[in-house]
Amino acid sequence: MSVTPAGLRIPPPERRAPIHDDPVAVHGRPPVMWLLAAHGRSGAGTLAQIWAPAGDARRGWPAADRHRNVVVVCRTDRAGLDAAHDLLLQAQAGLVGDCTLLGLVLVPDAPGPLPKTLRRWAEVVASAAPAVWRVPYVEDLRTHRQNELAIWTPTEPDPPPPGRMRAPAPSTTSPHHDLAAIGREIFTAARNASGH
C-alpha cells in the first residue's frame, strides 16, 4: 500500500491513466521501456516504433508486464502539458501499480521555441519528473508512416549528427541523431532501474 505525501495534489480518477491488470506485451520480446502517451497524438506511438527496446503502453501503466519502466510522453501544447502533469502527479502519489517512472519526454507541437507562458508551464511540469528528455522537431517525420521509419537499436552505433556539409539522413533510412541519443539515454535509465 502506498502512502501519498501530504499536500500532494492528486488528479481525479478520470484524469489518471489506468493500471493494466494484464500484460500489454503479448508477442515477441517484452519492451525494456514503456512509453505512456499522456494524450492522443502525443508522439508515443511514433517513438515506440523508432526505439526498438520501447513499447507503447496503450495509455495505461503496464503493471503486469515483466519490465515496468515508464516514460510519460506529451506534446508541448497546453493540453498535452496538462495531461502529462496529471500522470506525473499520479506517479508521485504511488498510484501506478509496481511501475517505475523514469521521466518525461517532451515532443514539440510546432517548430521553433515555445511561447513564454508554455515554456514556464513546461518547466513546472518537468519539475515533477525524475528526468526530462526534449525531442527536437523533426520535419521529416511528418511525411512518413510509422511503419516506414528506420528503427534504432542499442546494439548499433548512433547515426552521425548532421554537419555543415551533410544533411540529416531521411527518417526512413536512419533514425534522427537526436532521437537515437535520447533513446539510448532512456534505455540506459531503464536498464539501471531494472538492476542491469
Describe the role of every protein-language-model region.
Residues 90-97, 123-128, 192-193:
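Cytoplasmic membrane-interface segments at the C-terminal ends of transmembrane helices
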Residues 78-87, 113-118:
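Active-site-adjacent loop/helix micro-motif of nuclease/hydrolase catalytic cores
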Residues 38, 75, 102-116, 135-148:
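G-domain G4 guanine-recognition motif of GTPases
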Residues 124-156:
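Beta-strand-loop-alpha "switch" segments that mediate conformational coupling across diverse proteins
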